[in-house]
Amino acid sequence: MRTLFVGDLHLSADRPDITQAFLTFLETQLTDTSALYILGDLFEVWVGDDIAEPFANQLADAIKLASKKLPIYFIHGNRDFLIGERFAQRSGMTLLPEVYKLDLYGTTTVLLHGDSLCTLDKPYQRFRKFRNLSWAKWIYNHLPKSKRLNIAAKLRSKSQSSNQHKSYSIMDVEPSAVLELLDNTNAQQMIHGHTHRPAIHQLSNGKRRIVVGDWYEQGSMLCISQDNVELIELPFGK
C-alpha cells in the first residue's frame, strides 16, 4: 500500500484541462492507496461554500465517489482557505488543521500547505494573519455574493502584480522557519506545497523536507510507501 499527496492544482473553470487531469487521477491513480492528502490550493479561488461554481460541484461528486474507496484529507491553501464543512461533507473530504502531524510508515511527519513558511514575505504574512481571524472570515462570508467575488478578483490581481516584483528567496520558504516547525512538532519529515518547486530536500540536521508539485503544465503527485518516496509527473492527456 501507498499514501498519495497532491497540492496546488488551482482548479478553475478556465482550465478544463487541469480539471480533466484531476478527474482522471481520481479514477486511475488510487489503486493500492491507503489515503490521499490534498495540501491546499485545490481551487484557484474559493469565495464560499454557498457559491460554488458548477464545475466545483462536478469535482465534489468525483471526490465523493473516490472517498468511498479511501479516506481523503484536505488542508487549506492560501487560495481556498474559505472551504468549509459544507463543501467538505459534500465531497467526502476530512478537513485537517493548518499543521497536521502523523506517523507515516514509522516516520513522524508534519503536513501543511507551506505559505506560513515564507516568513520573509512580510506583507503577505500580515494579510495571512488577518484573513485567518474568525471574525474576519465571518464578516466576509456574510457579504453579498457579488461583493465577495469582486474582493476575490481584486486580491488575485494584486497578488499576481506584487509577486512579479518579489525575489526568488522571498517567494520560497525560510529555512529557519522549516527547522523551527520540525523542532516544535518533533517531526522527522515535512511535506508541503505552495512554492511550486517540487523537490526532496535532505536537511543538515538529518531530517527531510518534501515539496509537492503544482498542476499548471502537468499533474504531479508524491507517492510514499514503506520502502519508497517518489515525486511522479502526470502529463496531461495521458
Swiss-Prot record:
Binding site for Mn(2+) 2: D41, N78, H113, H194
Cellular compartments per GO CC: cytoplasm; extrinsic component of plasma membrane
Main localization of the protein described in the UniProt heading: membrane
UniProt KW Protease keyword: no
Keywords of the record: Cell inner membrane, Cell membrane, Hydrolase, Lipid A biosynthesis, Lipid biosynthesis, Lipid metabolism, Manganese, Membrane, Metal-binding
Organism superkingdom: Bacteria
GO molecular function: manganese ion binding; UDP-2,3-diacylglucosamine hydrolase activity
Enzyme Commission (EC) number: 3.6.1.54
Binding site for Mn(2+) 1: D8, H10, D41, H196
SUPFAM superfamilies: Metallo-dependent phosphatases
Cellular compartment(s): Cell inner membrane
Residues that hold substrate according to the record: N78, R79, D121, S159, N163, K166, H194
Any Pfam family the entry gives: Metallophos
The record's free-text note on cofactor binding: Binds 2 Mn(2+) ions per subunit in a binuclear metal center.
Stored InterPro entries: Calcineurin-like_PHP_ApaH, LpxH-like, Metallo-depent_PP-like, UDP-diacylglucosamine_Hdrlase
Cofactor requirement: Mn(2+)
Topology of this chain in the membrane: Peripheral membrane protein
BP terms from Gene Ontology: lipid A biosynthetic process
Catalytic activity as recorded in UniProt: UDP-2-N,3-O-bis[(3R)-3-hydroxytetradecanoyl]-alpha-D-glucosamine + H2O = 2-N,3-O-bis[(3R)-3-hydroxytetradecanoyl]-alpha-D-glucosaminyl 1-phosphate + UMP + 2 H(+)
The protein's annotated pathway: Glycolipid biosynthesis; lipid IV(A) biosynthesis; lipid IV(A) from (3R)-3-hydroxytetradecanoyl-[acyl-carrier-protein] and UDP-N-acetyl-alpha-D-glucosamine: step 4/6
Function noted in UniProt: Hydrolyzes the pyrophosphate bond of UDP-2,3-diacylglucosamine to yield 2,3-diacylglucosamine 1-phosphate (lipid X) and UMP by catalyzing the attack of water at the alpha-P atom. Involved in the biosynthesis of lipid A, a phosphorylated glycolipid that anchors the lipopolysaccharide to the outer membrane of the cell.
Family affiliation: Belongs to the LpxH family.
Annotated protein name in UniProt: UDP-2,3-diacylglucosamine hydrolase
Gene transcribed to yield this protein: lpxH
